[in-house]
Amino acid sequence: MKILMLGNSFTYCNDLDKMLAERLGACVVRNVRGGARLSEQLNPATELGANAKKLFEEKWDYVVLQEMSRGPVTEKESFMQSVKELSSRARECGAKPLLYATWAYREGSEKLASTGLGYKEMTQALHDSYHEAAQIGGCLVADVGDAFYEMREKADELFVEDDYHPGVYGSGLAADIIAAVIREDVKNG
């Protein structure tokens, strides 16, 4: 199985790609940059876009899409359009697109306060945007953000000190959820 992951630091923190490869016995390749938005993967004038263009010439089984942390809420139109276009490209190279739905910033953090949203409100807004994008792009969804919300009492393990990047436990949880979605899809054919 070959998996391509497109995203940013939420995808490369703690070598999430390697965690996913171990869980699935798959070849996992990532095309990432800290702070990147999915729209950069579509722009051949950027390094990410040029790399993505080459990567989409290969055959893949799954393409995992992860948007900048608050992008699905604050740049919703761009997010939806990027998912639509990247999902189409994924299918053209034989892959199923899968959205890695991320989480709200840590409850009570300054980072969360800077959004003007509460923890539950940001969690729900991200959930809604990712699921709307999944409908538009015909994507599978790995609801990692929902799991972070349900496990918020373990915030010290889910997050590192900056209150938004995942700790090793958080990345492991993400790998488990993405792997479970892929296994279920393979099982259901």
What is the meaning of each model-derived region?
Residues 29, 64, 98, 140-142:
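Hydrophobic/aromatic beta-strand patches that form the interior of the parallel beta-sheet core
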Residues 78-88, 92, 121, 125-132:
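Alpha-helical scaffolding segments of alpha/beta enzyme cores, especially the outer helices
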Residues 21-24, 90, 134:
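A generic structural signal for well-ordered alpha-helical segments
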Residues 88-98, 139:
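A short helix->loop->beta-strand "cap" motif at the edges of active sites that frequently abuts
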Residues 110, 115-189:
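Catalytic His-Asp segment of secreted/periplasmic serine-dependent ester chemistry enzymes
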Residues 2-6, 10-84:
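Conserved SGNH/GDSL esterase-like catalytic core that processes O-acyl groups on lipids
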Residues 5, 99-101:
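Structural beta-sheet core signal
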Residues 62, 68-74, 105-124:
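Serine-dependent acyl-ester chemistry module
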